[in-house]
Design a protein with these regions (language model features):
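A short, exposed loop/beta-hairpin motif centered on an aromatic-Gly-Thr core
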Residues: 77-86
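A short, structured beta-strand/loop element
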Residues: 64-71
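Short linear proline/tyrosine/threonine-rich motifs used for host-factor recruitment
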Residues: 36-38, 62, 79, 113, ...
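Intrinsically disordered, low-complexity proline/glycine-rich segments
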Residues: 68, 127-129
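Short, positively charged and aromatic/hydrophobic N-terminal segments
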Residues: 3, 7, 13-14
């Protein structure tokens, strides 16, 4: 499992983040999957909202995880991803799309640009988020 952390300059808002996640997953449907391994065989479900397929009652050897998992606390946004199912470049593009969608809902008139691993406001030049 790889991990990318984005640190914002202000506390995150749940509703804006939910909007950003929906927009980002709609733009990148190949990351909107869930992997289920059952006794050594892995299958994928295309939508993480959908219920998993029927499995045996004894789930002693099952594991279920999303290809991209997002969690946040205050100013930190952590994105954990499966190294085997996607590349770091795909997830980095997903994080940039998520930040853009989040900021378009949170501050609709803010224009931003990406400078390396920083997202910067064009007018004030202040750092909106840093990506590690």
């Amino acid at each position: 499992m790889g991990k990318i952390v984005a640190t914002f300059a202000e506390p995150l808002h749940h509703i804006c983040l939910t909007y950003g996640l929906k927009q980002s997953f709609d733009a990148m449907p190949h990351l909107n999957r869930r992997e289920i391994r059952l006794r050594g065989k892995s299958t994928y479900i295309e939508n993480i909202v959908a219920p998993p397929p029927l499995m045996s009652r004894s789930g002693w050897n099952t594991r279920c995880r999303n290809i991209v998992s997002v969690s946040y606390w205050r100013e930190s946004l952590a994105i954990a991803y499966n190294d085997e199912a996607c590349t770091k470049e795909d997830v980095y593009t997903f994080v940039i799309a998520l930040i853009k969608a989040y900021m378009s809902y949170r501050h609709p008139y803010t224009k931003m640009r990406i400078e390396g691993n920083k997202v910067v406001s064009e007018r004030e030049g202040r750092i909106i988020a840093t990506i590690d």
